[in-house]
Amino acid sequence: MLLPWLILIPFIGGFLCWQTERFGVKVPRWIALVTMGLTLALSLQLWLQGGYSLTQSAGIPQWQSEFDMPWIPRFGISIHLAIDGLSLLMVVLTGLLGVLAVLCSWKEIEKYQGFFHLNLMWILGGVIGVFLAIDMFLFFFFWEMMLVPMYFLIALWGHKASDGKTRITAATKFFIYTQASGLVMLIAIQALVFVHYNATGVWTFNYEELLNTPMSNGVEYLLMLGFFSAFAVKMPVVPLHGWLPDAHSQAPTAGSVDRAGILLKTAAYGLLRFSLPLFPNASAEFAPIAMWLGVIGIFYGAWMAFAQTDIKRLIAYTSVSHMGFVLIAIYTGSQLAYQGAVIQMIAHGLSAAGLFILCGQLYERIHTRDMRMMGGLWSKMKWLPALSLFFAVATLGMPGTGNFVGEFMILFGSFQVVPVITVISTFGLVFASVYSLAMLHRAYFGKAKSQIASQELPGMSLRELFMILLLVVLLVLLGFYPQPILDTSHSAIGNIQQWFVNSVTTTRP
């Protein structure tokens, strides 16, 4: 019964934030913080209950906890929520970054506090819904629900970019990209349900029943492309990444933390949970194309990051590069690479959130994100430059951080399957060090390039230090002791991999 509350609490909390603004501007902040703290506590409670090592020999999903309530029985639509090791880890990450998103916007947001926190909470509620829903109609409902509050977050509280683009442009671009790709996925879901009805005479949107839908190879390939296009835009996969740099550079810090830390993960989760198991033969056929798109993403993201002058755009392009590794891992069919992808998703969520929070703190002090206006900041403020150095080396995959474990497992697992692609993508790690160190050099070293950068700047407050040090501790823990994460996700990932490999090697039921 905990599962519906994981989704309801952020929605109820968001509504309360909106309504209580009249009692004072600080009230919505505290309600939002308590709401996300409660969501995180509930998800940790589910984790402590255990039961994530369940496996069935057939590779059919095995859920630790399930909630099923009829919604529209005529079409087989129900409010069907379930959790296993993979979705649990994503929900915990959402809860954690939700708390940090509220904390990092504590001083940044001054107007419409209640409506801001309503949008923030509803995004997080929608994301948790995506991770828990296993009714395809409900999944699509939550998938689309995330978009509207994110649009408002960028359009109302965004910053003007250093190249003069407006926040409305960025918000509209984000909305059109994701809405259009979501529409393609809706058509694919409806087609899948119709194909299943033609074969069995039963209307259903239930994921477990749709897994056994008999269909021809051509139909399977078309439906798989429908799902892949929606996930590829959100991930993002080059060349469908056009919305990301603008949306990141104009969004408020909380929006960037949520998008890089959580929203991009919904796409990787969707590929693992839905695209591979529902369309195994088509996915296996499409795998070489997907993996080469991942390789292109790794290098394109790295080159574009190096060329940026806006520090937030630079970090946005690093996400394109890092998610390229995850895309390669997903299509290898290797258990080790899948486990690496899960670690990489969590580590990237933590390190990208850290970089965006530090960017926000830097912006509050010098009121620019243009690295051409920075320089020489290392000696001008305490803590912030050194912590930026930590997150920069974490991003480039330094041993001792979670990013290294994730990338190493992905490359090690992929090498057994696609050695050429693995060797080429390894060079992407070299470029990662180039853009990470270039960012540090331009912002913190050399001579001060503007009046603001040459002044003494205030250090970090306890709130700012707490957020960043928490992320540092978690990244180092993940780097030295990833075993709890691997144990939790092992069974769920094993089921997905087994179903995928068995369906490809045998004929589809």
Where are these regions (language model features)?
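C-terminal ends of transmembrane helices
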Residues: 15-22, 98-110, 152-166, 234-249, ...
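Structural signature of hydrophobic alpha-helical transmembrane segments
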Residues: 1-9, 83-94, 137-149, 220-231, ...
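Alpha-helical multi-pass transmembrane bundles of energy-transducing inner-membrane proteins
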Residues: 23-25, 118, 122, 126-215, ...
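Transmembrane helix-loop-helix hairpins at membrane boundaries of multipass inner-membrane proteins
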Residues: 1-2, 16-118, 199, 204, ...
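Central hydrophobic cores of alpha-helical transmembrane segments in multi-pass inner-membrane proteins
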Residues: 4-19, 34-46, 91-105, 123-124, ...
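Juxtamembrane/interfacial segments at transmembrane-helix boundaries in multi-pass membrane proteins
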Residues: 50-78, 163-171, 182-241, 271, ...
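Alpha-helical transmembrane segments of multipass membrane proteins
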Residues: 14-19, 44, 102-103, 125-129, ...
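Predominantly late transmembrane helices and immediately cytosolic-facing juxtamembrane segments
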Residues: 238, 352-355, 422-456
